[in-house]
Amino acid sequence: LDRLPYLSADTKTLQVSSFDRTGGDFDITTGNQNGSGGCLASGGVGCVIAEDRGAGEIDSIWFTRDNGNVTRMGAIRVDLDGHTVVDAPLQSLVDGGLGAPFVWPLVANAAQSPAGVYVKVPMPYRQSMRISVASNLQYYHVDYRQFSNVEGVRTFSPSDPALDVITTLRAAGTIDPKPPAPSAAHHNRGVELAAGATATIAESTGSGSISSLRLRLPNPADQALNRLRLRIEFDDRTTVDSPLGEFFGAGLGASDVRSLMFATIRQPDGSFSLSDWWPMPFARAARVSLVNATADPVGGIDADVVTVPDPQWAPALASGRVGYFTAYSHAGPTILGQDWLFADEQGHGKFVGVSHTIRGSRTKTSFSD
C-alpha cells in the first residue's frame, strides 16, 4: 500500500453489468434482465456473466435479488486458465462457507452488505477467465482488469488463505495498513480557528511523503465536518481541497466510518477522531491547512500529521512514475436527464475512489437508489 502512488501504463479496468443492452427503459414486469436474463452466453454451470482472454484479474463480483438472498441462483463457478477454482452454491460462498480466503470482508452476504452480496477476493489469471451462475440471474456487476502481459502474474489458487491480508482488512479504520516507517516525524498542534481563518497544521520540506493525518474534533462535530475544509499543497500546488466530512467519508454528518485508508470514529468522551493513511509524496515541500468557512470560531481541534523523508519521491515524481495525491470536492443540485460529473482529469494517473453524499430534494434523507 505504500506503493500506491506509483502509476502503471499497462492495465485496463473493465466492468460487465446487468444494464439493458437494448437501450430500453426499465420494465417493472420483467426487471432489468436484458431480454435474456442477463446472460452473455450459455456455459459453465449455466449462464456466463463474464469472460476474458489474456492476462488479467477478477477484482469484484456483486449480485442482488430477493433483498440479497441469492439462494435461488444456485451455484457459481469461476474458471481461470482452464481450471475451476470456485464451484459452490453462491449463497454458501458469500456466507463464508468455503473458508479463507473466501471470508468476510473479502466476501459478504446481505446482512453484511445491505441488499446485495459480493466477492472481492482478487483472482489473477494468465490466459483466460469465465464466471457463470446456474439460474435466476437479475442484477450483477463484475469488475476486472486486463494486463498487457503475463510477467509476474500467477494464477489464483484457493489453497492460499491469505490470512495476513484478511487480518489487515478486518482492522480497517483502526490502524495504518502501510508498513511502518522508522524515520517518520510527527507534527502535533492544537488548532483554534477564528471565523473565516486558515491555519497551517503541518509543513515539511525536501523529498518525502505525508504518511498519515489525524484530527480530533470536539463534540458536536457536525458543523466542523461540513464547514471546515482540508487543503494540502504539494510543491506549491493545491491538490487537496475538501470539506472534512467528505474527505473522511462522513459527508452526511458525525457517524462512525471505517475504511482501509481512512476513518471517522466517535471516541468515549464524545469527540470524533478523523484518520487518513493515504501515502502522499512530494518532491520539495508540503503544507497542510484547515480553513474555517463558518461565521463562528471553531476551537478545540487537535492535529497530528506524520511525514516521512525519502529521496526516492523527487525523481519518481519528476519522471512521471509517481502521481500527486488529489482530492477535490464539488456539490450542487442534479439536473433531470443530465449526468453528474464527479471528475474530469487529464493526463496519466490512478483513480482510487469516490466519497459522495446524496440528499433528497424534498426529504433530505430520501434518495432511493
Q: Predicted segments — roles?
A:
Residues L1-D369:
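Beta-strand-centric surfaces of beta-sandwich/beta-rich domains
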